Amino acid sequence: FLMIRRPPRSTPKPSSAASDVYKRQHKMYGPTGLGILYGKKKWLEELPPYQGGGGMIKEVKKDRITYGDLPNKYEAGTMATAQVIAFDQSIKFLENIGIENIIKHEKELIEYGQEVLRKNNSVKIIGNPKNKGGVLSFTIEGVHPHDIATILDEDGVAIRAGHHCCQILHDKLEIPASARASVGVYNTKEDFDQLNESINKCKKIFDLKWI
């Protein structure tokens, strides 16, 4: 059994290798608390439900439980009605902009961001894949990423700091953590200019004159 998390812009369809795929709504400009589980029927019927509640059973006896048909088996309790309605709107939002337009916009921003940060000799960009996604991870020698994130937050620049769900990779790179800037449809090149200015502020606060 193999479950794969698909990126927001991909088509959620199980392959011959994957039994199930899932996507999260908040990765698609929607609210939190809802996602998609798209799987092969034989596995969804065989797997036990992850939680119990009203509406997901056919019959309860002292010695056995008969679960409801799919998808009711996995939809216990009150449905997240507001999130479902919002999910529809977030899909329409993405379709109106166009996935290809979003990819093009993010690629241009990341390329610009790399160009800007490469000129800052205190910044080390992590990774440089040919087809880089909408994220840019970096470190500043002498400054912990959590401190970077806190200082940038004071300037209204929101980034993520930590392991980003890949601690093994950070161990391989021999770094305790990293800072990560992510881009979306609402970001501009000016955001990376501000990021660079705030990074220079970090250098001053930590008195990194040698950098």
Task: Show which residues each predicted segment covers.
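Single conserved hydrophobic/aromatic residue that forms the stacking wall/gate
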Residues: 1-18, 22
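Pyridoxal 5′-phosphate
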Residues: 16-211
